[in-house]
Amino acid sequence: MKKITPYLLLALLLTGCYRDQGNYDYTLDSMNEIKSVTFIPSVVMTAEGEVIEVQQALDEQSCTRRIEATVEQTLATDLDALEFYWCRSYVDEQGKAVKDTLRTKGYMEFVLPVGKAMSYGIFLQIYDRTTDLSHYASFKVNTRPIFKNSLFVLHGSEGERQVGNIEVIGGETKIYTDVKVVTRDNNHYENVSGLGYTTFMNIPDDLTQIGVTNTLLLYASHGETKAYDPHGMDVKYTAEQIFKPVSETFAYHRTIQTGDPSNYTQYKVVLTESGEVYVGNYVHALYKPGMACENSADLPHQSDYTITAATITHNRFLLWDAKHGRFLYSSKDDNGFAIDEGNSIKPSFISSSPLLDAHVRFDGLQHSPATMTAVMGYINYRDNYDQQNAYFIFRDDASGDYYRYELLKLDIGDGSKAPQRRGAAAEVSEPLAAYSIVSEKRLVGLTPTHMSTITYNAWFTTSNLFFAEGGTVYRYNVSNGDKFAVYEAPEGYEVTKIKFRAEESSSFSDDLGLYLNIVLTDGTHGAVAEIKFTTAADVDEDYPTLFYDRDDAGHRWGEIRDIQFVYDYIYKMIY
């Protein structure tokens, strides 16, 4: 035993002194690895997690869909050694919860019901037989209503107008010069002259029916104005259910809309070509101001006017009456406005706030706007800020110059009991003004080809306006007159209209107001371009300039009359 012990100690000592040479050969380079898996259609991140959106089925022929997986591997170039397990969970048309597994290699087919929503929960295992390792992915497949977050395009000559659409789904763009190719509806769009849109959380009398509602307004002559569900173009309301009251001579001119639908502070003004005016809130209904007001001898309701420009402040609609060269105003807090869709069609809801003369004085100005052409009105901040001032831009037709006037709201109460100014002999003189012009500025360098292209967006500072001259869109600095080209049209095109996806930020609108849609014409056919800005109003160089001059079948746009981006109420949560 004593002889063995020294040998054991020597062996242990030699083992402890062994030097690791580091010559291991694990042959990792010879093992295949799944580096990434991507899908067509592509996955987007939403509040639900990763989701693939597919357009809803419109007929039996479009019910079966397919998702394809693209697998990037380090060694293999095919899918021969891979096994796919598509584990699915969903509720079928009979309301039964279903779980199944498909083993199709590289793709998964699934079925959608016609015209209905559908959702699949997917857990994908890709097993590599050469390594005995697996790669996993988890996502949802949701149906996407047609024309969701898309641009509607009204084009063609009056009497032959069509409604088209540009829709981006993942990496695919679908373009239709006629939506009837998709919707197969029998609607008449021939006399439509303008587009409008509202979306909000509708809270009806029956609280079990609470939900988001979306309404696309197609303004038309001959009493043909209608409100549609944009996701299918089903008629929701007729002219008699929209206008309070209906105008027999209605011809759409433009819409001014401000506020946040998520907190029910959105309001709008709709102007006609003949100077009629309608006002309203976030619901689709439109009211002639003061139709049910109690008239006052001291503050008479004004009904003789030609309204050509307007803006919306914290608590008022502020309008320019070109017929009498004056400003008018009306309260937004109108008890006659319906606050849900169901009640909006009832005859009992009608505007009760009078339209009043603001008695704004021009005698201290170098250039009175009374004889000028009103171009537009806007506000210097979001409309729920009660200290904002209003701005109106006018064009002097004699000189071609543009002027901006800033209006300060004066504290004379709520407007219904404005005190009268009295002279020394206790005789009534001019009533107090509701607004005062506090600044007058000539806008040097503002040279639009069409003055209707002058645009303001509340996403940016009040020093920035946008306008088009020829084929160029400019950002214009009101403070110093500098202008900077932000878009150049292709040769042969002229810009006729510019319109942001949204003109004011809201809780769920994310970056909608940074996208500018541009309408162009070559004299015969129209086209649509899109650019994106940064929050500093610079062009976002990371966003490609988009240009659409024909649909997927090669059909060209006619002359484009109007465009309207239709977005989801919770757009921010979806994209």
Regions found by a protein language model. Give the residues of each.
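Hydrophobic core register within WD40 beta-propeller blades
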Residues: L195, L207, M451-A458, I498, ...
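Sec-dependent signal peptide recognition
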Residues: K2-L9
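Extended, charge-rich low-complexity regions and/or helical-solenoid scaffolds
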Residues: S452-I531
